[in-house]
């Protein structure tokens, strides 16, 4: 088969210098993205390759909260920090399409929420995002559409509600806990919202 983007096959697309940076890929092992001795040098080299101003580097550093690791070797920082640094490098040229492989691996709950909000902002401005992940909780909260693969075949496809609500095994903890009590709850926020609405109704009565 062929993979096409904007009418061009990927092989043709890669040879088009004007298309450089339009497709971004984050591989499962983010160390593969680094060749320089520090995170700062890596970002600067990438920005130089795309002829980007310093302000763009500073923006992604701020977005991904990398100030504390800029002088560190990529091999010396934590998995979550490395993941954030790799995503920062990916975002520098402002790609139109982003492929992410296990992007939330190593991230704590706080930064997962921050990262999910970032993906929403990117999607809102027209960036297409394809995420491969085993993090069902993250997908349920932040994905617009999901597809579940088993043995190389798509066995379910649709909104997170379509894919996860009726699934007994591949679903979120919130869904398992609230099933039969709270309708259509996939995330902790939805469970909390339902409880708050019940409490308000009780007080009103």
Language-model regions, residue ranges each:
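Conserved ABC ATPase signature
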Residues: 73-77, 81
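H-loop/switch region of ABC-family ATPase nucleotide-binding domains
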Residues: 133-134
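Conserved ABC ATPase "signature" region
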Residues: 52-69
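Conserved beta-strand-loop-alpha-helix hinge in the C-terminal portion
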Residues: 153-176
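A short, surface-exposed alpha-helical micro-motif characterized by mixed small hydrophobic
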Residues: 139-141
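Catalytic Walker B motif of ABC-type/P-loop ATPase nucleotide-binding domains
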Residues: 98-101
């Amino acid at each position: 088969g062929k993979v096409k983007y904007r009418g061009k096959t990927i092989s043709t697309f890669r040879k088009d210098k004007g298309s450089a940076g339009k497709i971004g890929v984050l591989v499962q092992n983010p160390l593969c993205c680094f060749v320089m001795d520090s995170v700062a040098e890596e970002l600067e080299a990438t920005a130089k390759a795309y002829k980007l101003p310093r302000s763009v580097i500073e923006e992604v550093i701020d977005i991904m909260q990398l100030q504390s690791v800029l002088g560190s070797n990529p091999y010396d920082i934590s998995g979550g920090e490395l993941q954030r640094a790799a995503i920062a490098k990916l975002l520098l040229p402002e790609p139109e399409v982003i492929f992410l492989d296990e992007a939330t691996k190593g991230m704590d709950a706080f930064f997962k929420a921050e990262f999910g909000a970032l993906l929403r902002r990117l999607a809102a401005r027209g960036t297409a995002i394809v995420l491969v992940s085993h993090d069902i909780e993250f997908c349920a909260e932040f994905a617009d559409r999901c597809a579940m693969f088993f043995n190389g075949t798509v066995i379910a496809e649709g909104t997170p509600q379509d894919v996860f609500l009726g699934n007994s095994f591949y679903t979120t903890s919130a869904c398992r806990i609230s099933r039969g009590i709270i309708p259509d709850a996939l995330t902790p926020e939805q469970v909390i919202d339902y409880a708050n609405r019940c409490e308000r109704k009780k007080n009103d009565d």
